[in-house]
Protein backbone atom coordinates (compact mmCIF):
# COMPACT_ATOMS: atom_id res chain seq x y z
CA UNK A 1 0.00 0.00 0.00
CA UNK A 2 2.97 2.33 0.43
CA UNK A 3 3.29 3.23 -3.27
CA UNK A 4 -0.44 3.94 -3.59
CA UNK A 5 -0.54 5.91 -0.33
CA UNK A 6 2.43 8.05 -1.40
CA UNK A 7 0.68 8.81 -4.70
CA UNK A 8 -2.47 10.12 -3.03
CA UNK A 9 -0.61 11.80 -0.17
CA UNK A 10 1.17 14.00 -2.73
CA UNK A 11 -2.21 14.97 -4.17
CA UNK A 12 -3.52 15.93 -0.72
CA UNK A 13 -0.39 17.97 0.01
CA UNK A 14 -0.88 19.95 -3.21
CA UNK A 15 -4.50 20.66 -2.31
CA UNK A 16 -3.53 21.79 1.19
CA UNK A 17 -1.03 24.26 -0.30
CA UNK A 18 -3.87 26.08 -2.08
CA UNK A 19 -4.84 29.35 -0.38
CA UNK A 20 -7.95 30.17 -2.38
CA UNK A 21 -10.10 28.00 -4.67
CA UNK A 22 -11.36 29.90 -7.70
CA UNK A 23 -12.41 28.35 -11.03
CA UNK A 24 -8.87 28.29 -12.44
CA UNK A 25 -7.53 26.65 -9.28
CA UNK A 26 -10.36 24.13 -9.30
CA UNK A 27 -9.56 23.15 -12.88
CA UNK A 28 -5.88 22.70 -12.02
CA UNK A 29 -6.83 20.52 -9.03
CA UNK A 30 -9.14 18.50 -11.29
CA UNK A 31 -6.25 17.87 -13.69
CA UNK A 32 -4.04 16.83 -10.76
CA UNK A 33 -6.73 14.42 -9.57
CA UNK A 34 -6.94 12.93 -13.07
CA UNK A 35 -3.16 12.51 -13.25
CA UNK A 36 -3.14 10.76 -9.87
CA UNK A 37 -5.96 8.38 -10.79
CA UNK A 38 -4.35 7.54 -14.13
CA UNK A 39 -1.04 6.81 -12.39
CA UNK A 40 -2.99 4.43 -10.15
CA UNK A 41 -4.22 2.78 -13.39
CA UNK A 42 -7.88 3.62 -12.83
CA UNK A 43 -9.87 3.08 -16.07
CA UNK A 44 -10.18 6.26 -18.14
CA UNK A 45 -13.99 6.32 -18.15
CA UNK A 46 -14.04 6.07 -14.36
CA UNK A 47 -11.47 8.86 -14.08
CA UNK A 48 -13.66 11.20 -16.13
CA UNK A 49 -16.84 10.36 -14.21
CA UNK A 50 -15.02 10.70 -10.89
CA UNK A 51 -13.55 14.12 -11.76
CA UNK A 52 -16.85 15.46 -13.13
CA UNK A 53 -18.69 14.43 -9.95
CA UNK A 54 -16.05 15.89 -7.62
CA UNK A 55 -15.83 19.23 -9.48
CA UNK A 56 -19.64 19.52 -9.61
CA UNK A 57 -19.87 19.01 -5.84
CA UNK A 58 -17.15 21.56 -5.08
CA UNK A 59 -18.91 24.15 -7.24
CA UNK A 60 -22.37 23.55 -5.78
CA UNK A 61 -21.82 22.58 -2.13
CA UNK A 62 -21.01 25.02 0.64
CA UNK A 63 -18.45 23.87 3.26
CA UNK A 64 -19.76 23.59 6.85
CA UNK A 65 -19.02 26.50 9.17
CA UNK A 66 -15.41 26.55 10.30
CA UNK A 67 -14.15 24.21 7.57
CA UNK A 68 -11.73 25.79 5.05
CA UNK A 69 -12.66 25.17 1.37
CA UNK A 70 -9.48 23.16 0.74
CA UNK A 71 -10.27 20.84 3.67
CA UNK A 72 -13.79 20.35 2.34
CA UNK A 73 -12.37 19.61 -1.10
CA UNK A 74 -10.28 16.84 0.45
CA UNK A 75 -13.39 15.49 2.15
CA UNK A 76 -15.30 15.48 -1.17
CA UNK A 77 -12.33 13.67 -2.71
CA UNK A 78 -12.57 11.14 0.13
CA UNK A 79 -16.30 10.52 -0.39
CA UNK A 80 -15.99 10.14 -4.16
CA UNK A 81 -13.03 7.77 -3.79
CA UNK A 82 -15.09 5.62 -1.43
CA UNK A 83 -17.77 5.33 -4.13
CA UNK A 84 -15.11 4.53 -6.73
CA UNK A 85 -13.65 1.75 -4.58
CA UNK A 86 -16.95 -0.03 -3.98
CA UNK A 87 -19.18 2.09 -1.77
CA UNK A 88 -19.82 2.81 1.89
CA UNK A 89 -20.69 -0.67 3.10
CA UNK A 90 -17.84 -3.22 3.31
CA UNK A 91 -18.65 -6.68 1.98
CA UNK A 92 -18.46 -9.28 4.75
CA UNK A 93 -17.19 -12.85 4.52
CA UNK A 94 -19.44 -14.94 6.77
CA UNK A 95 -19.75 -18.73 6.49
CA UNK A 96 -23.44 -19.58 6.91
CA UNK A 97 -23.43 -23.40 6.94
CA UNK A 98 -21.22 -26.39 7.65
CA UNK A 99 -19.21 -27.23 5.68
CA UNK A 100 -19.08 -23.89 3.89
CA UNK A 101 -17.33 -24.64 0.60
CA UNK A 102 -15.15 -21.91 -0.92
CA UNK A 103 -13.80 -22.26 -4.48
CA UNK A 104 -10.70 -20.17 -5.32
CA UNK A 105 -9.99 -19.10 -8.91
CA UNK A 106 -7.35 -16.93 -10.52
CA UNK A 107 -4.87 -16.57 -13.36
CA UNK A 108 -1.39 -18.00 -13.02
CA UNK A 109 0.88 -15.86 -10.86
CA UNK A 110 -1.91 -14.07 -9.01
CA UNK A 111 -0.84 -15.49 -5.64
CA UNK A 112 -3.92 -17.69 -5.43
CA UNK A 113 -2.42 -20.68 -3.59
CA UNK A 114 -0.78 -18.48 -0.95
CA UNK A 115 -4.01 -16.52 -0.65
CA UNK A 116 -5.95 -19.71 0.05
CA UNK A 117 -3.71 -20.26 3.09
CA UNK A 118 -4.11 -16.61 4.14
CA UNK A 119 -7.89 -16.91 3.97
CA UNK A 120 -7.75 -20.16 5.94
CA UNK A 121 -5.59 -18.51 8.59
CA UNK A 122 -7.94 -15.52 8.78
CA UNK A 123 -10.93 -17.80 9.38
CA UNK A 124 -9.08 -20.04 11.85
CA UNK A 125 -8.24 -17.01 13.99
CA UNK A 126 -11.98 -16.40 14.20
CA UNK A 127 -12.74 -19.84 15.51
CA UNK A 128 -13.51 -21.79 12.33
CA UNK A 129 -12.04 -25.21 11.61
CA UNK A 130 -10.77 -24.92 8.04
CA UNK A 131 -9.77 -27.66 5.58
CA UNK A 132 -7.83 -27.15 2.35
CA UNK A 133 -7.98 -29.04 -0.95
CA UNK A 134 -5.52 -28.73 -3.85
CA UNK A 135 -6.94 -29.64 -7.27
CA UNK A 136 -4.15 -28.26 -9.49
CA UNK A 137 -2.99 -31.12 -11.74
CA UNK A 138 -1.00 -28.84 -14.06
CA UNK A 139 1.60 -27.27 -11.78
CA UNK A 140 3.52 -30.04 -9.94
CA UNK A 141 4.67 -27.71 -7.16
CA UNK A 142 1.12 -26.67 -6.24
CA UNK A 143 0.47 -29.83 -4.21
CA UNK A 144 3.63 -29.41 -2.12
CA UNK A 145 3.12 -25.66 -1.72
CA UNK A 146 -0.40 -25.87 -0.34
CA UNK A 147 0.38 -28.92 1.80
CA UNK A 148 3.29 -27.06 3.42
CA UNK A 149 1.17 -23.97 3.98
CA UNK A 150 -1.60 -26.09 5.50
CA UNK A 151 0.90 -27.70 7.86
CA UNK A 152 2.26 -24.27 8.79
CA UNK A 153 -1.14 -22.96 9.88
CA UNK A 154 -2.42 -26.29 11.24
CA UNK A 155 -5.20 -26.89 8.71
CA UNK A 156 -6.29 -30.37 7.49
CA UNK A 157 -5.22 -30.92 3.87
CA UNK A 158 -6.29 -33.12 0.98
CA UNK A 159 -4.58 -33.44 -2.39
CA UNK A 160 -3.26 -36.05 -4.81
CA UNK A 161 0.32 -35.50 -5.95
CA UNK A 162 -0.10 -37.62 -9.10
CA UNK A 163 -3.81 -36.94 -9.62
CA UNK A 164 -5.04 -36.35 -13.16
CA UNK A 165 -8.70 -35.44 -12.72
CA UNK A 166 -9.23 -32.13 -10.89
CA UNK A 167 -12.99 -32.64 -10.61
CA UNK A 168 -12.63 -36.02 -8.90
CA UNK A 169 -9.93 -34.68 -6.57
CA UNK A 170 -12.33 -31.92 -5.53
CA UNK A 171 -15.10 -34.46 -4.89
CA UNK A 172 -12.82 -36.71 -2.83
CA UNK A 173 -11.51 -33.70 -0.93
CA UNK A 174 -15.02 -32.74 0.14
CA UNK A 175 -15.69 -36.36 1.19
CA UNK A 176 -12.44 -36.69 3.16
CA UNK A 177 -12.70 -33.40 5.07
CA UNK A 178 -16.31 -33.59 6.21
CA UNK A 179 -15.66 -32.46 9.79
CA UNK A 180 -14.50 -28.92 8.97
CA UNK A 181 -16.52 -25.71 9.20
CA UNK A 182 -15.04 -24.21 6.03
CA UNK A 183 -13.47 -26.03 3.09
CA UNK A 184 -11.23 -24.04 0.73
CA UNK A 185 -10.64 -25.59 -2.70
CA UNK A 186 -7.67 -24.26 -4.66
CA UNK A 187 -7.74 -24.63 -8.46
CA UNK A 188 -5.11 -24.46 -11.20
CA UNK A 189 -3.98 -20.99 -12.20
CA UNK A 190 -5.05 -20.21 -15.71
CA UNK A 191 -5.00 -17.60 -18.44
CA UNK A 192 -8.48 -16.16 -18.88
CA UNK A 193 -8.54 -17.20 -22.56
CA UNK A 194 -7.73 -20.86 -21.93
CA UNK A 195 -11.10 -22.36 -22.74
CA UNK A 196 -10.36 -25.89 -21.49
CA UNK A 197 -9.19 -24.71 -18.08
CA UNK A 198 -12.18 -22.41 -17.68
CA UNK A 199 -14.41 -25.37 -18.52
CA UNK A 200 -12.58 -27.36 -15.82
CA UNK A 201 -13.37 -24.68 -13.24
CA UNK A 202 -17.02 -24.80 -14.27
CA UNK A 203 -16.99 -28.61 -13.91
CA UNK A 204 -15.53 -28.36 -10.38
CA UNK A 205 -18.17 -25.76 -9.55
CA UNK A 206 -20.95 -28.07 -10.75
CA UNK A 207 -19.46 -31.05 -8.89
CA UNK A 208 -19.00 -29.52 -5.42
CA UNK A 209 -21.66 -26.76 -5.53
CA UNK A 210 -19.59 -24.19 -3.57
CA UNK A 211 -21.22 -21.66 -1.29
CA UNK A 212 -18.79 -18.92 -2.28
CA UNK A 213 -16.60 -18.42 -5.35
CA UNK A 214 -13.51 -16.27 -4.77
CA UNK A 215 -11.50 -14.71 -7.59
CA UNK A 216 -7.91 -13.79 -6.72
CA UNK A 217 -6.51 -10.85 -8.72
CA UNK A 218 -2.96 -9.49 -8.77
CA UNK A 219 -2.95 -5.72 -8.03
CA UNK A 220 -0.20 -5.15 -10.59
CA UNK A 221 -2.65 -5.79 -13.45
CA UNK A 222 -4.43 -2.55 -12.56
CA UNK A 223 -7.48 -1.81 -14.69
CA UNK A 224 -7.14 -5.18 -16.48
CA UNK A 225 -8.64 -6.70 -13.32
CA UNK A 226 -12.07 -5.96 -14.78
CA UNK A 227 -11.35 -8.12 -17.85
CA UNK A 228 -10.23 -11.01 -15.63
CA UNK A 229 -13.36 -10.80 -13.50
CA UNK A 230 -15.66 -10.55 -16.51
CA UNK A 231 -13.99 -13.55 -18.23
CA UNK A 232 -14.62 -15.81 -15.22
CA UNK A 233 -18.14 -14.41 -14.77
CA UNK A 234 -19.08 -15.87 -18.16
CA UNK A 235 -18.70 -19.35 -16.68
CA UNK A 236 -19.74 -19.05 -13.04
CA UNK A 237 -20.78 -16.44 -10.48
CA UNK A 238 -18.05 -14.51 -8.65
CA UNK A 239 -19.12 -13.72 -5.08
CA UNK A 240 -15.85 -12.36 -3.73
CA UNK A 241 -12.65 -10.81 -5.07
CA UNK A 242 -9.32 -10.72 -3.24
CA UNK A 243 -6.72 -8.25 -4.54
CA UNK A 244 -3.17 -9.46 -3.82
CA UNK A 245 0.19 -7.64 -3.76
CA UNK A 246 -1.34 -4.33 -2.68
CA UNK A 247 1.88 -3.63 -0.78
CA UNK A 248 4.03 -3.57 -3.92
CA UNK A 249 2.29 -1.39 -6.52
CA UNK A 250 0.44 1.89 -7.01
CA UNK A 251 -1.79 0.16 -9.59
CA UNK A 252 -3.86 -1.46 -6.85
CA UNK A 253 -6.21 1.53 -6.89
CA UNK A 254 -6.99 0.83 -10.52
CA UNK A 255 -7.57 -2.85 -9.77
CA UNK A 256 -9.99 -2.00 -6.96
CA UNK A 257 -11.92 0.51 -9.06
CA UNK A 258 -12.04 -1.81 -12.08
CA UNK A 259 -13.39 -4.72 -10.05
CA UNK A 260 -16.01 -2.50 -8.38
CA UNK A 261 -17.17 -1.47 -11.86
CA UNK A 262 -18.02 -5.12 -12.70
CA UNK A 263 -20.30 -5.40 -9.67
CA UNK A 264 -18.07 -7.96 -7.93
CA UNK A 265 -17.23 -7.23 -4.29
CA UNK A 266 -13.67 -6.95 -3.02
CA UNK A 267 -13.67 -8.45 0.47
CA UNK A 268 -9.94 -8.75 1.20
CA UNK A 269 -6.62 -7.29 0.13
CA UNK A 270 -3.23 -8.96 0.44
CA UNK A 271 -0.62 -6.62 1.95
CA UNK A 272 2.43 -8.89 2.22
CA UNK A 273 3.76 -12.39 1.71
CA UNK A 274 3.16 -13.77 5.21
CA UNK A 275 0.04 -15.87 5.87
CA UNK A 276 -1.08 -13.24 8.41
CA UNK A 277 -1.05 -10.42 5.85
CA UNK A 278 -4.62 -10.49 4.59
CA UNK A 279 -6.89 -7.57 5.51
CA UNK A 280 -10.68 -7.25 5.22
CA UNK A 281 -11.36 -4.53 2.65
CA UNK A 282 -13.36 -1.57 3.92
CA UNK A 283 -13.55 1.12 1.21
CA UNK A 284 -14.10 3.94 3.70
CA UNK A 285 -11.17 3.06 5.96
CA UNK A 286 -8.96 2.20 2.99
CA UNK A 287 -9.50 5.60 1.38
CA UNK A 288 -9.02 7.42 4.70
CA UNK A 289 -5.61 5.80 5.03
CA UNK A 290 -4.78 6.65 1.40
CA UNK A 291 -5.46 10.33 2.03
CA UNK A 292 -3.64 10.47 5.37
CA UNK A 293 -6.91 10.93 7.28
CA UNK A 294 -6.18 8.01 9.62
CA UNK A 295 -8.81 5.58 10.84
CA UNK A 296 -11.03 8.01 12.73
CA UNK A 297 -13.83 5.54 13.39
CA UNK A 298 -11.46 3.10 15.09
CA UNK A 299 -9.88 5.93 17.06
CA UNK A 300 -13.25 7.27 18.20
CA UNK A 301 -14.38 3.80 19.23
CA UNK A 302 -11.26 3.37 21.34
CA UNK A 303 -11.63 6.77 22.97
CA UNK A 304 -15.34 6.40 23.69
CA UNK A 305 -14.82 2.93 25.16
CA UNK A 306 -12.42 4.45 27.68
CA UNK A 307 -13.63 8.01 28.25
CA UNK A 308 -17.07 7.11 29.51
CA UNK A 309 -17.65 10.31 31.50
CA UNK A 310 -19.81 12.68 29.48
CA UNK A 311 -17.93 15.86 30.41
CA UNK A 312 -14.63 14.34 29.28
CA UNK A 313 -16.12 13.39 25.91
CA UNK A 314 -17.40 16.95 25.58
CA UNK A 315 -13.91 18.30 26.29
CA UNK A 316 -12.31 16.10 23.63
CA UNK A 317 -15.01 16.59 21.00
CA UNK A 318 -15.00 20.36 21.51
CA UNK A 319 -11.26 20.49 20.88
CA UNK A 320 -10.54 21.65 24.46
CA UNK A 321 -8.19 19.31 26.25
CA UNK A 322 -6.52 20.80 29.34
CA UNK A 323 -4.18 19.14 31.81
CA UNK A 324 -7.00 18.60 34.28
CA UNK A 325 -8.82 16.40 31.76
CA UNK A 326 -5.51 14.72 31.00
CA UNK A 327 -5.00 14.03 34.71
CA UNK A 328 -8.51 12.59 35.17
CA UNK A 329 -7.97 10.14 32.34
CA UNK A 330 -4.33 9.15 32.77
CA UNK A 331 -5.31 5.71 34.05
CA UNK A 332 -7.89 5.24 31.31
CA UNK A 333 -5.32 6.01 28.63
CA UNK A 334 -3.56 2.78 29.52
CA UNK A 335 -6.71 0.85 28.56
CA UNK A 336 -6.41 2.06 24.97
CA UNK A 337 -3.68 -0.51 24.40
CA UNK A 338 -0.21 0.24 23.05
CA UNK A 339 -0.05 3.95 22.26
CA UNK A 340 1.93 3.20 19.10
CA UNK A 341 -1.22 1.53 17.71
CA UNK A 342 -3.42 4.42 18.80
CA UNK A 343 -1.21 7.04 17.15
CA UNK A 344 -1.31 5.08 13.87
CA UNK A 345 -5.02 5.89 13.67
CA UNK A 346 -4.46 9.65 13.82
CA UNK A 347 -5.44 11.75 10.79
CA UNK A 348 -3.50 14.41 8.96
CA UNK A 349 -0.12 12.72 9.28
CA UNK A 350 0.01 13.41 13.02
CA UNK A 351 1.41 9.95 13.70
CA UNK A 352 4.49 10.77 11.65
CA UNK A 353 5.07 13.90 13.75
CA UNK A 354 5.26 11.88 16.96
CA UNK A 355 8.58 10.08 17.22
CA UNK A 356 8.91 6.46 18.27
CA UNK A 357 10.89 7.66 21.28
CA UNK A 358 7.98 9.85 22.39
CA UNK A 359 5.54 6.98 21.99
CA UNK A 360 7.74 4.61 23.97
CA UNK A 361 8.22 7.24 26.65
CA UNK A 362 4.48 7.83 26.92
CA UNK A 363 3.79 4.11 27.33
CA UNK A 364 6.41 3.63 30.04
CA UNK A 365 5.91 6.80 32.03
CA UNK A 366 2.17 7.18 32.60
CA UNK A 367 2.71 6.75 36.35
CA UNK A 368 5.41 9.42 36.29
CA UNK A 369 3.04 11.78 34.50
CA UNK A 370 0.37 11.22 37.14
CA UNK A 371 2.89 12.28 39.79
CA UNK A 372 3.81 15.36 37.75
CA UNK A 373 0.17 16.36 37.29
CA UNK A 374 -0.53 15.81 40.98
CA UNK A 375 2.25 18.28 41.77
CA UNK A 376 0.54 21.07 39.80
CA UNK A 377 -1.90 23.64 41.11
CA UNK A 378 -5.47 23.81 39.80
CA UNK A 379 -4.57 27.03 37.97
CA UNK A 380 -1.69 25.28 36.19
CA UNK A 381 -3.85 22.30 35.24
CA UNK A 382 -6.50 24.54 33.70
CA UNK A 383 -4.05 26.94 32.05
CA UNK A 384 -0.83 25.15 30.97
CA UNK A 385 0.34 28.29 29.14
CA UNK A 386 1.52 29.78 32.45
CA UNK A 387 4.06 26.98 33.00
CA UNK A 388 7.37 28.84 32.93
CA UNK A 389 10.82 27.54 33.92
CA UNK A 390 10.35 28.40 37.61
CA UNK A 391 7.02 26.58 37.86
CA UNK A 392 8.42 23.57 36.00
CA UNK A 393 11.32 23.31 38.49
CA UNK A 394 8.86 23.43 41.42
CA UNK A 395 6.60 20.79 39.84
CA UNK A 396 9.57 18.51 39.13
CA UNK A 397 10.79 18.79 42.72
CA UNK A 398 7.34 17.94 44.10
CA UNK A 399 6.96 14.94 41.78
CA UNK A 400 10.47 13.57 42.34
CA UNK A 401 11.40 13.92 38.67
CA UNK A 402 13.60 16.22 36.58
CA UNK A 403 12.46 19.39 34.77
CA UNK A 404 13.22 17.52 31.54
CA UNK A 405 10.62 14.87 32.51
CA UNK A 406 8.01 17.61 32.96
CA UNK A 407 8.82 19.15 29.56
CA UNK A 408 8.60 15.76 27.84
CA UNK A 409 5.15 15.16 29.35
CA UNK A 410 4.04 18.58 28.13
CA UNK A 411 5.21 17.69 24.60
CA UNK A 412 3.00 14.59 24.61
CA UNK A 413 0.13 16.66 26.00
CA UNK A 414 0.48 19.14 23.12
CA UNK A 415 0.27 16.29 20.60
CA UNK A 416 -2.90 14.97 22.25
CA UNK A 417 -4.32 18.49 22.17
CA UNK A 418 -3.71 18.62 18.40
CA UNK A 419 -5.48 15.28 18.09
CA UNK A 420 -8.56 16.60 19.89
CA UNK A 421 -8.73 19.59 17.54
CA UNK A 422 -8.53 17.30 14.54
CA UNK A 423 -11.33 15.14 15.93
CA UNK A 424 -13.45 18.25 16.33
CA UNK A 425 -12.95 19.20 12.67
CA UNK A 426 -13.73 15.67 11.43
CA UNK A 427 -16.86 15.48 13.58
CA UNK A 428 -18.10 18.71 12.00
CA UNK A 429 -17.67 17.17 8.58
CA UNK A 430 -19.48 14.01 9.64
CA UNK A 431 -22.39 15.98 11.10
CA UNK A 432 -22.70 17.95 7.87
CA UNK A 433 -23.20 14.83 5.74
UniProtKB/Swiss-Prot annotation:
Catalytic activity: GTP + H2O = GDP + phosphate + H(+)
Enzyme class, spelled out: hydrolase
Keyword tRNA-binding in annotation: no
The keyword Repressor is assigned to this record: no
Residues binding GTP: 106-113, 186-190, 244-247
Enzyme nomenclature, EC number: 3.6.5.4
Key words, A-Z: Cytoplasm, GTP-binding, Hydrolase, Nucleotide-binding, Ribonucleoprotein, RNA-binding, Signal recognition particle
Main location: cytoplasm
Cellular localization per UniProt: Cytoplasm
Stored InterPro entries: AAA+_ATPase, P-loop_NTPase, Signal_recog_part_SRP54_M_sf, Signal_recog_particl_SRP54_hlx, Signal_recog_particle_SRP54_M, SRP/SRP_N, SRP54, SRP54_GTPase_dom
GO cellular component assignments: signal recognition particle
One Pfam short name: SRP54
One GO term (biological process): SRP-dependent cotranslational protein targeting to membrane
GO molecular function: 7S RNA binding; ATP hydrolysis activity; GTP binding; GTPase activity
UniProt record similarity statement: Belongs to the GTP-binding SRP family. SRP54 subfamily.
PANTHER family: SIGNAL RECOGNITION PARTICLE 54K PROTEIN SRP54, SIGNAL RECOGNITION PARTICLE SUBUNIT SRP54
Function statement: Involved in targeting and insertion of nascent membrane proteins into the cytoplasmic membrane. Binds to the hydrophobic signal sequence of the ribosome-nascent chain (RNC) as it emerges from the ribosomes. The SRP-RNC complex is then targeted to the cytoplasmic membrane where it interacts with the SRP receptor FtsY.
Description of how the protein assembles with itself and partners: Part of the signal recognition particle protein translocation system, which is composed of SRP and FtsY. Archaeal SRP consists of a 7S RNA molecule of 300 nucleotides and two protein subunits: SRP54 and SRP19.
Domain remark text: Composed of three domains: the N-terminal N domain, which is responsible for interactions with the ribosome, the central G domain, which binds GTP, and the C-terminal M domain, which binds the RNA and the signal sequence of the RNC.
Name the UniProt record assigns to this protein: Signal recognition particle 54 kDa protein
Record lineage: Archaea, Thermoproteota, Thermoprotei, Thermoproteales, Thermoproteaceae
Gene from which the chain derives: srp54
